[in-house]
Amino acid sequence: MEERCESTESPQGQGRKNTKCGWLRKQGGFVKTWHTRWFVLKGDQLYYFKDEDETKPLGTIFLHGNKVIEHPCNEENPGKFLFDVVPGGERDRMTANHESYLLMASTQNDMEDWVKSIRRVIWGPFGGGIFGQKLEDTVRYEKRYGNRLAPMLVEQCVDFIRQRGLKEEGLFRLPGQANLVKELQDAFDCGEKPSFDSNTDVHTVASLLKLYLRELPEPVVPYAKYEDFLSCATLLSKEEEAGVKELMKQVKSLPVVNYNLLKYICRFLDEVQSYSGVNKMSAQNLATVFGPNILRPKVEDPLTIMEGTVVVQQLMSVMISKHDRLFPKDTEPQSKPQDGPNSNNNDGHKKATMGQLQNKENNNTKESPVRRCSWDKPESPQRSSVDNGSPTALSGSKTNSPRNSIHKLDISRSPPLMVKKNPAFNKGSGIVTNGSFSSSNAEGVEKPQTTPNGSLQARRTSSLKSSGTKMGTHSVQNGTVRMGILNTDTLGNSLNGRSMSWLPNGYVTLRDNKQKEPAGESGQHNRLSTYDNVHQQFSSMSLDDKHSVDSATWSTSSCEISLPENSNSCRSSTTTCPEQDFYVGNFEDPVLDGPPQDDLSHPGDYENKSDRRSVGGRSSRATSSSDNSETFVGNTSSNHSALHSLVSSLKQEMTKQKIEYESRIKSLEQRNLTLETEMLSLHDELDQERKKFTMIEIKMRNAERAKEDAEKRNDMLQKEMEQFFSTFGDLTVEPRRSERGNTIWIQ
């Protein structure tokens, strides 16, 4: 009753290859009678002919937009294997003719083959119909989701079994629930992506995986390679090493998609047999189960199957146990993140399991370079002079605090950052993209204050507002931005022994909870990261000419730094994050700032002042204006030109990006208008078709009524004719009788 037409061209093919052809019975007509027709599945259309040799089809069924429904066999209609091709499918799309077709096959297998073939045509463009689909076609479609070693169905089943079923006794040997396997198969064939949860039976998923491999049109090892692989098994029985080498040669000669799938399956089965003490599935048992699905002859006659069963089992067992030699791992260097002592990313790396490594290799993904943060210890001339002059004055310095350490940003290794707009930013503020930043007005203002003993100290007042990593306040010297870190969730760790207390007036005090270290080491952590294109020089600054960096915010996704338009140094703005608000006022570091130059000769006085600052909850900084002003003025011109050239180039880059994004937005809007116009036209056409359909229904009803009226008139005429003939017959018979009665006999 049914015939496959995949490799030959039928007379109805007109030069195109048919997917499937055979005899089916179709119900049609007003009286719903069954007609036997020759059906040909070609492309996305199903043709039916009166005879196999006919060239002109009686009709065509357009499959796209339809769906197939199987009718279960019942006791009322035994021997009828029915299925419907009805409108619907994805999002209930309507077909061109809005008709449904009831078809009947001769056997259950015949019906299932037709249903699978039709579903493959309907759902193939949407990723469905994968059961019975060619492996290369499935891989070609799924390339849009990334390169993979195996189809997504195989990956999903393997991942689920790896998580929940490796210790299940009788895995792959015990069958799953047939109805659940059928439901999952139908779901995948209809383009759906069903997910497995904790209630899903492991044996059902394992049966689904075996079913997919069994229903491939051509097995993982192609038919042309079947005899070559069997010869390898014969060689293995004689000389194992030579057999393994020959098997490696044959495996490498497989097509790429077949090689990748075989590699994926063998590695997974080796992982399964590693739990053989629990699941009772050794390599030999797994080879018995998977061998016929991986290696099978083209003609499956009983004699060939019996002869090749033992050989296939032996060969499959070798491929599982020696998969490391047969499928060498790709030696691709993968970057491993190296976190510094106070890196922004403090999460430790977890050891990946075998399944995770295999999925990484399957997805062909490499670990993207992560933004690095490292701390180095250059020595500041200013701090060195202070240490040499008064070792006891800075004995309590914190070498590991963010203010005293260098936060180096490896821009070359960081991934590109997306530009984000924040309405909370002031005009002129910008977002750093790959290390670039735009200018804006500074918020913080330096306020010189007088200490109790009469010495001047510069106090920086700013408000740090962020939910993530905070940047401390530092001065800019020679065009270099010094950035410290204040992280709200790792204050205790990042400050390494410096406690933080809040005062009623909003000030912040950093107290020393760590033992003092030698003065020679305390001067090695005083500057922060510098840009490579700006030379770092340390010199004293005067109080009047000093411009400090109030605050800056650093996160793993964006960095925002603002510059004053007419200033000699960089001043950063703050960033607002929606998660939480964190304010810091009058932030100072007495250890980094150091004592006033006038008080270096009296270490004891400086210690007393430090104690008073600690008790009062404040820290201050004082610098000498007479010694630092001349040096700073000398470096102002070079800093000014370097920073403004950088700002101008970054502004140009942001302008280009803005133009590009605007053009993209306009093109998308234009495309949206075009699609809306097309949608309106399609809606109009749909309404017209519906009106036509309604008119045709009305005409059909009128025709049926006219037919009924004609039949009634015919009946009436028939009765009238019968009455007329009966009456006419009576009239002709009576005169004859009277004539006979009046006859005169003459003798």
Curated annotation (Swiss-Prot):
Bias (Low complexity): 616-629
Site residues by UniProt (Arginine finger): R173
GO cellular component assignments: adherens junction; cell projection; cytoplasm; cytoskeleton; focal adhesion
GO biological process, any: negative regulation of ruffle assembly
Post-translational modification: Phosphorylated by ROCK, leading to activate the RacGAP activity.
Biased composition (Polar residues): 334-346, 355-367, 381-404, 431-475, 630-639
Domain Rho-GAP: residue ranges: 133-327
Keywords of this entry: Angiogenesis, Cell junction, Cell projection, Coiled coil, Cytoplasm, Cytoskeleton, Developmental protein, Differentiation, GTPase activation, Phosphoprotein
SMART domains in the record: PH (SM00233), RhoGAP (SM00324)
Keyword Phosphoprotein among UniProt keywords: yes
Compartments (UniProt record): Cytoplasm, Cytoskeleton; Cell junction, Adherens junction; Cell junction, Focal adhesion; Cell projection
Modified residues (Phosphoserine): S368, S390, S395, S397, S401, S412, S414, S436, S494
Domain PH stretches: 17-123
Comp. bias (Basic and acidic residues): 368-380, 599-614
Subunit structure: Interacts with FLNA.
Name the record gives this protein: Rho GTPase-activating protein 24
Lineage of the species this protein comes from: Eukaryota, Metazoa, Chordata, Craniata, Vertebrata
